[in-house]
Amino acid sequence: MVEADRPGKLFIGGLNLETDEKALEAEFGKYGRIVEVLLMKDRETNKSRGFAFVTFESPANAKAAARDMNGKSLDGKAIKVAQATKPAFESSRRGPPPPRSRGRPRFLRGTRGGGGGPRRSPSRGGPDDDGGYAGDFDLRPSRAPMPMKRGPPPPPRRAGPPPKRAAPSGPARSSGGGMRGRALAVRGRDGYSGPPRREPPPPRRDPYLGPRDEGYSSRDGYSSRDYREPRGFAPSPREYTHREYGHSSVRDDCPLRGYGDRDGYGCRDRDYGDHPSRGSYREPFESYGDLRGGAPGRGTPPSYGGGGRYEEYRGCSPDAYSGGRDSYSSSYGRSDRYSRGRDRVGRPDRGLSLSMERGCPPQRDSYSRSGCRVPRGGGRLGGRMERGGGRSRY
């Protein structure tokens, strides 16, 4: 690295800033002829930077001058005199600037790296460029698993409305159950059609027409109302199951009207109570409630079977209540129910009414005989009958 500059060139450092080329030439001219005096100055201020280069014509003169003048005082300052070296000089001259230039890049890097590093790390923390958006979406998926959870629930929710469209696969199940529920709803209406039409109270019809006609998707929103509605038009099983299982809400809804009027219902309650599968009544009832209650996602697969069983209890409940528990199991067997459910899914409009007409005329008879539905028919059942007409529009 340390290469001597051309022979006879001396480096003079530590100069007084006031010392100029003339003073240097006068001082060093004693040792020989000087070819060049180069005082390094600041470009901007044009002031001396404190060092200079003096080139002697004879290298021997340069050596003598360096030997004598090194460490001597010039203009009040001790000066350093040495053989100029290219790298030493240029590194000393440019070297400090290059360090500075390097320092500046480092500084800039520091700003870029420091500032940019923080920026990057925040960006990593935040959008993370792509990772951050991925992170962002990961967060959203974590939220969005709420969205995505929400997302999947919408398919189940859609599973509610798809009953109209005979939704595919899993939804189709709940759609089967849902169509069944709808068919039962209509069937229940037709089954009670005789009594209900006598006293259809518009207030009931209007509120229920809203949720019902808005679609089974309203099943999501109207879970509580739909929950009651099955009680309304199929109160027999629901009231029964609720009586058996102590759901006071239904007892409050229909006890005096439905059971108070009929001692026979008490007997039939005992009849059903004796039935060994009381728990199964409750389970299908609950699963059916889930299906209708807007948790199709939860209850879809069970709700199909549950719905079927519940429908059996429900659609045939009049027979069962009339004492035809066996006839309920035989004539309204699950296979019959399921085939009806399929018909309903295939033919949501006609299938409902036809299967109702075919499947549950006994309901109408038994209910007209028992009469316990008449008061409720005047209430919710009437509204549902009217809605039955409205639903067939779908």
From Swiss-Prot:
CDD domains recorded: RRM_RBMX_like
Keyword Ribonucleoprotein: yes
Signal sequence annotation: none
A GO MF term: RNA binding
Biased composition (Pro residues): 150-165
Record carries keyword RNA-binding: yes
Span list, region Disordered: 67-394
Biased composition (Low complexity): 321-333
PROSITE patterns, A to Z: RRM (PS50102)
One Pfam family cited in the UniProt record for this chain: RRM_1
Record field: compositional bias (Basic and acidic residues): 67-78, 196-231, 239-285, 334-350, 383-394
Gene Ontology CC terms: nucleus; ribonucleoprotein complex
SMART domains found in the cross-reference section: RRM
Protein name (database record): RNA-binding motif protein, X-linked-like-2
Species this protein is from: Macaca fascicularis
Lineage: Eukaryota, Metazoa, Chordata, Craniata, Vertebrata
